[in-house]
Amino acid sequence: MVRLVCSRILKFPKPYLWSATQTTSRCFNSRAQSHNLITKTITSSLQDVLTRPIWQNRSFVQCRRVSSYAQMVNNHQSVTIETFDALCKQVKIREALEVIDILEDKGYIVDFPRLLGLAKLCGEVEALEEARVVHDCITPLDARSYHTVIEMYSGCRSTDDALNVFNEMPKRNSETWGTMIRCLAKNGEGERAIDMFTRFIEEGNKPDKEIFKAVFFACVSIGDINEGLLHFESMYRDYGMVLSMEDYVNVIEMLAACGHLDEALDFVERMTVEPSVEMWETLMNLCWVQGYLELGDRFAELIKKLDASRMSKESNAGLVAAKASDSAMEKLKELRYCQMIRDDPKKRMHEFRAGDTSHLGTVSAFRSLKVQMLDIGFVPATRVCFVTVEEEEKEEQLLFRSNKLAFAHAIINSEARRPLTVLQNMRTCIDGHNTFKMISLITGRALIQRDKKKYHFYKNGVCSCKDYW
């Protein structure tokens, strides 16, 4: 029976081979048995027609994944859809996938919105292997569900997978193109993002403001303000768009994020409309991130006069940690995003907070790294420290920032030369950025940092963002 089914698979047209392997896995009690027989039956010359490699087949992933959660649950009757929801809230993605298997065995199919929610979680915690399994569970029904899958792969740093989904879409709208452009720019591929916009225009599409916003973000990733300003001019010159305050804010953010604060202020002075609170808020945050505290404080005073409530809400979201007065949603984001580090093949997560001294070995390791950094000319950017204390104490406070502790912990608890990844819930400051460039040079490691805005890839003392963030 087994060999008969396998022989029939070979007669299927090429587009159906992938579906056939998935269907066959349900014909046997042992998924491992079905995978082994299919692998032996399908010749190597036919393997290239599969839309994904055979090892990504969901049945095979199920074979090699230890069902730890299923082993804990002796009675599968106690596993319900509420179990799945609870695991998703706890960001336990692998366990949630195991529950999907259990529910399917009981004849219950997890609904589409829940699967899309799980896809978003995969992108948030950068779980690429699990993301591919979730993708196998999803059959996108509309453009929005395709966008969710693209954003999932973007969060997992797999732009190739995202592009595959994009190219497979039967129909794309402007939001689709904007999503793909942001995906490439966020992952440090600004040139490809600009090329994607060029392709968008060449195919006869008309851009909207959201597309241009994505293009500005791509220009920041390559540090090309001239390209961005040309696109800004084309908005009203070539496409007749009526500019809003949000459009001006986007340009200001592009200029300031590229380090051109003088040009940003000149742009504000030349504007024909009165600057909004949002514009001053953008300048304030970017000044603080880049270490221009005095100028940022001036903008802060101006914001307080115009709208004091802005200073206690989302105005500081990109710079300071969430406050006690923030909403429950912000607390949930903090739970998911707060300084997590993967340091082993099992993808365990470790959380670090500023001032955390519970990992004595971590602090000691970073002090040792700091000595080596100072020897080759590193100068701590103490101007980003807001507390009015002596210079030495500022350096000490910078030492205990959560992202530095996370990298130090990973260095001493992982194999030599292995790339390291840190996720954080705030934008990185200039001191942290310079620190990680030096660490990548000293240790010979590739460091990957995802902050609130984008990815940073550090290698041999250089960052992929070219110091524009």
Curated annotation (Swiss-Prot):
Residues 375-469 are annotated as: Type DYW motif. InterPro entries: DYW_dom, Pentatricopeptide_rpt, PPR_At4g14850-like_plant, TPR-like_helical_dom_sf. The keyword Acetylation does not apply. Its main location: mitochondrion. Residues 1-65 form a transit peptide. The keyword Transit peptide applies. It comes from the Eukaryota. It is found in: Mitochondrion. Keywords: Mitochondrion, Repeat, Transit peptide. GO terms for molecular function: RNA binding; zinc ion binding. Pfam families: DYW_deaminase, PPR. PPR repeats lie at residues 142-172, 173-207, 208-238, 244-274. GO terms for cellular component: mitochondrion. One of its GO terms (biological process) is RNA modification. PANTHER family: DYW DOMAIN-CONTAINING PROTEIN, PENTATRICOPEPTIDE REPEAT-CONTAINING PROTEIN. Belongs to the PPR family. PCMP-H subfamily. This is Pentatricopeptide repeat-containing protein At2g34370, mitochondrial. It comes from Arabidopsis thaliana (Mouse-ear cress). The gene is PCMP-H25.
